[in-house]
């Protein structure tokens, strides 16, 4: 269920598959990730890494052919993400499967259905890519 803000207006949520991040989007993604990590939902990190490490991580994700980065926005600001991870070509034994990883939503954006939309978009992408 989507919560309305104090003005009674329902926030706008959107999810998109990205293959490039503008500087402002990279900054928003790092901000959201840092808050999620601090809140305990840090997809492996116990404390936020230095900002340059986090930026390098997200840039690196975009370079890996087996990873699809989906970002979630709340009122046009990146507030979360998830990745669809396909097996590498040499992993024939698991060529039929893919995994969802690094799924998070910043604490300030929770309660609006963004997490569910990220999962739905990842499932749709898995189907589109024959998984």
What are these regions (language model features)?
Residues 1-14:
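Short, low-complexity, intrinsically disordered N-terminal peptides in bacterial proteins
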Residues 11, 16-96, 101-102, 106-108, ...:
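Acetyl-CoA-dependent GNAT
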């Amino acid at each position: 269920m989507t919560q309305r803000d104090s003005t009674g207006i329902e926030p706008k949520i959107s999810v998109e598959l990205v293959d490039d991040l503008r500087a402002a989007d990279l900054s928003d993604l790092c901000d959201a990730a840092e808050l999620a990590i601090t809140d305990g939902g840090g997809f492996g990190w116990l404390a936020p890494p230095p900002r340059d490490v986090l930026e390098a991580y997200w840039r690196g994700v975009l370079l890996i052919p087996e990873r699809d980065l989906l970002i979630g926005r709340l009122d046009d600001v990146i507030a979360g993400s998830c990745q669809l991870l396909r097996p590498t070509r040499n992993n024939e034994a698991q060529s039929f499967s893919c995994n969802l990883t690094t799924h998070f939503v910043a604490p300030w954006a929770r309660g609006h259905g963004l997490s569910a939309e990220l999962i739905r978009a990842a499932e749709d992408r898995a189907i589109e890519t024959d998984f």
